[in-house]
């Protein structure tokens, strides 16, 4: 009963939207009534479903004032007051419970892209939406918690200790063990098994529970530690395994409603459900769940770590207990053999179905799940056009159905980061793209072609086009326009791409100016449903007469967040708005994708915007 109610409450928390919660709750109430025939259960779930609507509301906007450091991460801090929490990125040496004066704040923003980790969304999941711009220290803490952190940070093997005790991930330990808190949990069971030879089970559990709470108070209550403490409390109050799991799910969802999809919570709960429901081949199902979840969350699996999972878990438990006394060999990372695979929706849906079936009864045929990575190419039926968010630069990827061809237009680089290493290559890898059939470098500017040398080291590139007179080798109409033109500078020499698929016409302008736009109008009778606006939306491009002649529906702009050029210009945005052209910009919307299948097409952005493109 408790497990059913808790899972229903968890579903409400995940849905977030009030209307979705209402619709789900109505259906779930019918299920509960059919199964339990109890009015009390129905009333309890109705109260919880209403409570979930309150829980999922975002916290209040952060304000200037006095904050206290509550979390320490590898490259930043989190500070809180009575109302909210903020991100602190500072060169100041801060410690737990230090008081700071926050003088100014700004929204957290990162260049987010499909399939890649989003630091902005990660913090939003913890109800942290703002970061400090200016701070000063008011009072250094003299608490035991801050002294412990200072002492551990000064140790020779501090990287290992900080990872195990505080969840501050370092490369010395595989991230999965840090996130799941297996250092502490394994240490707990080592101590438990030693003590139960002499003492009563319940007394040991109560003592270790108190110790766990004290540990969290003096160190940090990570998600994994909180979940583990809740489970230990449930063990003392409930005999039924299902009630124990249900209690853990319910109270974790109440305490951390925005983080119920964290791997620190999801994976242990999935494994506990397997342990409770599965009657045969339990070990195989657990391994299947483990490897699937690792692929879904991390998009890679270290085979060595996976095979030695149980052994390493116990090893890190020993390190946790003896961490202050162990030599430096612990900092040596275990050799890795990594398999990379970014599951698409087909795999995730198949995993959910197979997981539910395995809880009932395992069958060997369910292992066909792991053939999907090899079959997903045949599921890719959409024509896809991606505009990546690489800051103040350009990079677009055009993928034909079933990966028949991949064309990239530009691979811009940045002075502040390696765009290829941080964004372009990981995106291609996560989309299972290992070969680029044609790379079009529109012109020789760093923000358009600067990443080429780095990219060719990472990905096989069959053909590179730097001249409009060349041809793109694809089996759909793809033209490089205005081979003969009067160009006054490098920008006006930009290769202009025009292609058609599924009855949609696309025009990519590079950095071409209004003068080139006039030459295009004189040379061609062009119509374009989608235009990649020239020169990042600068007022040197996007002439109103030119845009009007194209009869565009959608405009795509690639520009950096708060860039020094003020791209896109207000003038360009007003022109697009006046012509009723729906405009999407990477600086505000993140990466942008257009999908089409015959006469059906739609556009989505990384920030969650969605729209159907009418033919």
Would you name each region that the model predicts?
Residues 1-61, 128, 145, 150, ...:
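N-terminal leader/targeting segments
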Residues 1-7, 27-29, 320, 328-382, ...:
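C-terminal regulatory/interaction regions
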Residues 6, 221-366, 512, 518-520, ...:
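Internal transmembrane alpha-helical bundles of multi-pass membrane proteins
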Residues 49-177, 421-429, 435, 469, ...:
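Membrane-interface helix/helix-cap signal primarily in integral membrane proteins
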Residues 125-232, 236, 480, 505-514, ...:
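Aromatic-rich juxtamembrane segments at the membrane interface
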Residues 173-199, 434-457, 533-545:
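Di-metal (Zn2+ and/or Mg2+/Mn2+) metal-binding site signature of metallo-dependent hydrolases
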Residues 258-259, 442, 446, 450-455, ...:
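Active-site-proximal loop/helix segments of hydrolase catalytic cores
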Residues 361-435, 469-530, 539-541, 588-615:
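Core dinuclear metal-dependent hydrolase active-site scaffold
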């Amino acid at each position: 009963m408790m497990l059913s109610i808790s899972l229903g409450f968890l579903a409400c928390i995940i849905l977030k939207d009030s209307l979705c919660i209402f619709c789900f709750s109505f259906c779930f109430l019918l299920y509960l009534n059919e199964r339990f025939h109890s009015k009390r259960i129905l009333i309890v779930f109705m109260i919880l479903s209403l409570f979930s609507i309150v829980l999922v509301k975002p916290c209040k906007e952060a304000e200037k004032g006095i904050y206290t450091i509550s979390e320490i991460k590898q490259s930043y801090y989190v500070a809180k007051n009575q109302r909210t929490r903020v991100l602190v990125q500072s060169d100041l040496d801060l410690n737990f419970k230090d008081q700071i004066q926050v003088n100014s704040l700004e929204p957290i923003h990162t260049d987010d892209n499909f399939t890649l980790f989003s630091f902005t969304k990660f913090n939003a999941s913890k109800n942290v939406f703002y970061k400090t711009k200016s701070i000063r220290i008011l009072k250094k803490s003299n608490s035991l918690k801050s002294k412990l952190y200072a002492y551990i940070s000064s140790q020779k093997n501090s990287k290992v200790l900080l990872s195990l005790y505080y969840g501050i991930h370092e490369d010395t330990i595989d991230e999965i063990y840090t996130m799941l808190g297996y250092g502490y949990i394994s240490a707990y069971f080592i101590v438990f098994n030693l003590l139960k030879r002499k003492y009563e089970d319940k007394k040991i559990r109560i003592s270790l529970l108190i110790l766990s709470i004290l540990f969290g108070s003096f160190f940090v209550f990570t998600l994994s530690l909180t979940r583990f403490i809740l489970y230990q409390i449930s063990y003392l109050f409930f005999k039924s395994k299902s009630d124990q799991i249900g209690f853990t799910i319910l109270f974790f969802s109440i305490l951390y409603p925005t983080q119920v999809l964290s791997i620190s919570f999801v994976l242990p709960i999935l494994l506990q459900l397997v342990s409770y429901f599965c009657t045969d081949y339990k070990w195989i199902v657990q391994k299947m769940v483990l490897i699937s979840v690792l692929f879904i969350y991390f998009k890679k699996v270290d085979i060595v770590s996976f095979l030695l999972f149980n052994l390493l878990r116990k090893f890190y438990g020993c390190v946790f207990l003896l961490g202050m006394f162990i030599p430096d060999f612990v900092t040596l990372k275990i050799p890795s053999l990594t398999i990379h695979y970014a599951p698409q929706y087909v795999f995730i849906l198949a995993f959910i179905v197979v997981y539910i079936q395995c809880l009932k009864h395992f069958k060997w045929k369910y292992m066909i799940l792991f053939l999907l990575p090899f079959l997903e190419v045949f599921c890719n039926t959409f024509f896809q056009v991606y505009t990546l968010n690489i800051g103040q630069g350009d990079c677009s990827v055009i993928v034909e159905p079933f990966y028949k061809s991949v064309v990239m237009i530009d691979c811009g680089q940045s002075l502040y980061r390696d765009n290829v290493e941080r964004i372009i290559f990981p995106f291609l890898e996560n989309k299972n793209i290992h070969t680029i059939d044609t790379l079009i470098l529109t012109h020789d500017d760093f923000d358009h072609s600067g990443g080429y040398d780095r990219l060719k080291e990472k990905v096989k590139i069959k053909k590179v086009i730097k001249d409009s007179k060349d041809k793109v080798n694809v089996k759909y109409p793809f033209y490089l326009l205005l081979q003969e033109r009067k160009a006054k500078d490098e920008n006006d020499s930009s290769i202009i791409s025009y292609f058609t698929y599924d009855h949609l016409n696309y025009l990519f302008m590079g950095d071409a100016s209004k003068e080139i736009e006039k030459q295009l109008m004189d040379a061609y009778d062009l119509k374009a449903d989608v235009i990649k606006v020239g020169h990042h939306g600068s007022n040197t491009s996007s002439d109103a007469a030119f845009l009007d002649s194209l009869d565009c529906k959608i405009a795509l702009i690639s520009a950096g967040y708060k860039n020094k050029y003020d791209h896109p210009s207000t003038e360009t945005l007003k022109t697009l708005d006046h012509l009723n052209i729906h405009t999407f910009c990477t600086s505000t919307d993140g990466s942008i994708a257009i999908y089409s299948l015959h006469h059906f097409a739609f556009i989505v952005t990384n920030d969650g915007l969605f729209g159907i493109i009418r033919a």
